[in-house]
Amino acid sequence: MTQAALAMSMTDPIDTTADAGLMARIDSACQRIAPLWPLKHFVAVNPFLGFTGQSFAATAATFERVVRTRMLMPRAFYRQALDDGRIDDAALAQALGAHPSTGLELNELKQKARAEAGTSSPPAVVATVAEVLDRLAEGDRYVSLVAFMIDEISAFCATYFDEGQASWPSPVRKLKPYAAWRTIAAYDRNPEVMGLTGFRKAIAELPADPVQAIGVIVDRLGIPERAVEDYLVRALFDLGGWSAYARYIGWSAGLDGQRDDTLLELLAIRLAWGYALYQARTDDAFKAAWAQAMAEAAKLPADQRLEETPELAIDLVLHEAYEIALRSKLVARLAGHGAQAVTRLPARPPVQAAFCIDVRSEIFRRALETAYPDAETIGFAGFFGFPIEYVPIGHSKGGAQCPVLLKPAFIVCEAVKDADDVEQSEVLGLRLLRRRAAKALKSFKVSAVSSFSFVETAGLGFAAKIATDSAGVTRPVPSPVVDGLDPEIAARVQPRLTPGELAGRATGFTDPQRVAMAEAVLKAMSLTGPFARLVLLAGHGSTTVNNPHASGLDCGACGGHTGEANARVAAAVLNDWQVREGLRAKGIDIPADCWFIGALHDTTTDDVTLFDEDDVPATLAQDLARLKARLTEAARLARLERSALLGISNKAAVDEAVIARSRDWSQVRPEWGLAGNTAFIAAPRSFTRGLNLGGRAFLHSYEAARDDGHRTLELIMTAPMVVASWINLQYYGSTVNNAAFGSGNKVLHNIVGQLGVLEGNAGDLRVGLPWQSVHDGSRLIHEPVRLNVFIAAPEAAMDEIMQRHQGVRDLVVNGWVMLHSLSDQGTIRRCVRPGEWRSA
């Protein structure tokens, strides 16, 4: 490693002054990539996030032309829907009306739908050097240069970005990515073994600055001016997984008000590989093929006209018709239900139970309302309005317990209830000691020197553990929540709200902050009175084993963590008598006999755990006992409803079977997560109570009459609605094209760097959901449709919010979500654009 390379620190700025135009194209290309959160807090992300500024149809054309991949189902899927009657003539006619540029008549469309899709490519596409070389290759022993390049870059990224899985850290970790890769490339002979002569020389000739290197490569490859940005986008999507992770690093830096160029540097690495391949081939055949590819790229259309890709246009219309047919049924059910009489609750219900808006909560809320008819259920984002960083005992930093669109505003540390300073120190010291011992044992097990001798000498000692893990009696890996803590101590752990300090950072809440947060949360929940005697705040999480994507089943509103911390913090704040005094001065009067209690809904087993029961006043003991009994009954009803999709045929043994799935380390489908999501409804519960939405709708409580200035409506449309669209589109992408937007076969997953998975032992980092999350082995469980949003609010207010927030406007106008207004009379109208609403 050279001294010059070592001198280039991680904080050295990138020179962006050489070519402002090129830098603008680079930034634009990088913005096209959606971020990928690491496994420890894996959250759903819209894979088309960088394309929402253009229409859904235009994006489909862009992906076919630039990325060379589809974002629609195969033609056979829509043909089957026609045969099954799920798409009717009315839906086809309406879809054709939305795409007049196709020039198709109804009968002509039906004929084409029943024919196999043509294989013709778009009129102009973007090709890379490696792709052109692969086209020229002959013989069955040829190794794809595209695959080889991706494997090599992926291997570098796995070592460079490793978050603690590797025993030996990368020696160039302190350098920026491009400098680190060039340092290693100077010694790497793998490319030359593959026949890429002069690889190291070509890389050494490139500028050390990544932006300058990109400029040189673009110039020497002769990429047409019109195609430069598309070429950069294509290069990034060649490494879609690692590009997405690099984008996450930049996203996180952006929340802190900083700029990070990791993705730009990865782009430079990818282009440098292409440049080295280009330099290695000087034969006439390649020169002619490359010239032809660049001539095609120069003809790229300035827009994405559907008539230029007729086969895509047909599939877009068929997909639109498929969605219209499904949406029509949903609209009819909502409109019909809204006109029915709704069972009235007591003026003061005995229990108010707030759950996350997650679609899995819809099933449990219906079950609880069946088991406890007088109870009122509420839907709200599962972080309960408290954007906190929750720091466990023994840690200096914690996870962000809030939507990834936000940055934590408060730091809350974990503490042991009723423990003095001496006991707190003992617990901390013991947990740190156990963590160090576990780390040392792991290092010994995987060490190159001791791994074989360890297995030979201690292998039999693990036989009992393997047996109990296989039987579901014990967990293969301890829960990180209680890892290193004695059971008695783990039962006493709780969040500490009092102000303090951690490594120079303020923790806890001041009294004014508690009052302000409590007021904001209650108003956002439309919960300002009357209050029940017991108010349940139920976050949610999941229980699975041997599941790399386990955090993806936890609460997305809590940043891929369980909602326990947020529920307990919110309940503790709202039970504070000083907070209640402050709220009373603001017009919110919480009665003295009202108590908030935090809880956690396990979406895998449907069990509900209540926290801090010892703090509940004795006068509410009977109320609490009644609630626990009703929750147990609701859990049984919810498991019974979910058992059909889980394939549990023995209804008498549903409870045991569901719990067994949560402990089975060979189970690839412990639960269905948010598969099937189709709708987001923000309205009073009276609009949907008694309506079976099949666990397919996000339900957010909202009462426009209580929303002065429509501030809560603005929060709903800019946060929960956007997050719901991210979830919906991740499931959509993982269903329509799992190879591009999903993570493939879960059985083949290998964790890399503790941050993501590979499918097998090589290739790109995988994004999105495993195939098993959307398909049961014989049929799709998730229907690939865009999110239908229904909000019971004035249309003019929604228009104003869309005008103020371009991101929300883009989602609606460009067809990424279908926004509807709901009225008390059951009238439903769809928004075409701000100011234009049509009957649905």
Curated annotation (Swiss-Prot):
Keywords tagged on the record: Cell inner membrane, Cell membrane, Membrane, Metal-binding, Transport, Zinc
Family label: Belongs to the inorganic carbon transporter (TC 9.A.2) DabA family.
Superkingdom assignment: Bacteria
Binding site for Zn(2+): C356, D358, H540, C555
Cofactor requirements of the protein: Zn(2+)
Function: Part of an energy-coupled inorganic carbon pump.
Organism expressing this protein natively: Bradyrhizobium sp. (strain ORS 278)
Chief site of localization: membrane
Protein name: Probable inorganic carbon transporter subunit DabA 2
Subunit structure: Forms a complex with DabB.
